[in-house]
Amino acid sequence: MSKRAYFGTDGIRGQANKHPMTAEVALRVGLAAGKLFRSQDDRRHLVVIGKDTRLSGYMIEPALVAGFASVGMDVRLFGPLPTPAVAMMTRSMRADLGVMISASHNDFADNGIKLFGPDGYKLSDEQELKIEALMDEGLQEGLAPPRGLGRVQRVDDAQARYIEIVKATFPRNMSLAGLRIVIDCAHGAAYKVAPQALYELGAEVFPVGVAPNGTNINAECGSTHPEAMARLVREYRADIGIALDGDADRLVICDEKGVVVDGDQIMAIIALALAKAGKLKAGGVVATVMSNLGLERLMTDNGLKLERTSVGDRYVMARMREGGFNIGGEQSGHVILSDFSTTGDGLIAALQVLAVMIETGRPMSALGRQFEPAPQILENVRFSGGKPLEHKTVKEAIADGEAQLNGSGRIVVRPSGTEPLIRIMAEGDDPALVKKVVKSIVSAVKAV
């Protein structure tokens, strides 16, 4: 595959007002993507656009709109809406393209652009490369004549539509009545829809992270800071806590005691329930190389399989589609349930866990520890440039660590696809050895 100039593992992402996350690049994305999808025939073409609550969304959104409208694509604006909702609405509104303006779990200073095809799935690498090629050539060609410019409208009921879709994934014979639920929306895209959906299903809802001001998204709250949710669960004596990230495509849960449950355990809860009901497809789960060894062992012990992919929910989804799986995800909390959605959806995943709680009559504390995690350490090392993983000393440190683990664990060292970080993960049955191995690799990376 050719080298990508703009797109990373999850669309285009960066600090607002710095390349590539500038108004100029956003305009080019609109022009290029609009030309690509409009060129297929002569009918009117439609793009739908959602965003999270970052201040820079007010800069990126109009730049994208200008690009799309100038090449003749009609635009529908959703305003703040979760990423999975934009994917769903792309398909339900029969749009040619869906756009989400978000940097997911990152700090407010970052932003990003994610693109979805008419089927609601993220664009392929090949499609992104075609857009990149168009971004760097003759953008003044193919502009629409004055009467052919795109029309732009806001969709006032986008949030209500998504709430109804989400509620439809919850069993009709069940209600959340009697359950006390803390929901942390990270001051992000789900700040209205998530509490409302839970309330309409009967829960007593304690919302937090629902006062976005443009700069507080993900700030000491949401799925990257579950301690805030856990504290409130204990304070309100809630049955469960649910923490979403800024664009609500991932979640973390905590039980009634405030113990945090990560994406691996959430996948295990849902997968085993599906298997018991005879609804698990392809005999297993798709996860990434970062998922805990304990999840793999649990699947094996239950006669199921765990298939691993590179990090990134797009790669998980690709393998799910290839193999016919209906559940996959990441330890970080992306949980994809393809019976309902084309991408990770934190709110839908939370509802499936709640359904298991109700079906079994067990508290979250009894469900949240489906397997004993193998001791695992993850360290992030920031770097300013170059390719640290190509240095001889780093390669030697990794090889030495693998030799020490001697088949009783795993090492994964990789660059982040969204930040200038090297992520170093090791796991195994001996916690002291795992710690030693990670420390050695971290030192090697920092030294280059």
UniProtKB/Swiss-Prot annotation:
Alphabetized Pfam families for the sequence: PGM_PMM_I, PGM_PMM_II, PGM_PMM_III, PGM_PMM_IV
Residues annotated as the enzyme's active site: 104
Cofactor(s) it depends on: Mg(2+)
Gene3D superfamilies in alphabetical order: Alpha-D-Glucose-1,6-Bisphosphate, subunit A, domain 3 (3.40.120.10), Alpha-D-phosphohexomutase, C-terminal domain (3.30.310.50)
Keywords for the protein's UniProt record, in alphabetical order: Isomerase, Magnesium, Metal-binding, Phosphoprotein
Substrates-to-products reaction catalysed: alpha-D-glucosamine 1-phosphate = D-glucosamine 6-phosphate
EC number, UniProt record: 5.4.2.10
Modification Phosphoserine, positions: 104
Cofactor note: Binds 1 Mg(2+) ion per subunit.
Example of a GO biological process term: UDP-N-acetylglucosamine biosynthetic process
Residues involved in Mg(2+) binding: 104, 245, 247, 249
GO cellular component, one term: cytosol
Gene Ontology molecular function: any one: magnesium ion binding
Post-translational modification: Activated by phosphorylation.
Top-rank taxon: Bacteria
Family to which this protein belongs: Belongs to the phosphohexose mutase family.
NCBIfam families: glmM (TIGR01455), PRK10887.1 (NF008139)
Primary role: Catalyzes the conversion of glucosamine-6-phosphate to glucosamine-1-phosphate.
Name of the protein: Phosphoglucosamine mutase
Organism: Caulobacter sp. (strain K31)
Gene: glmM
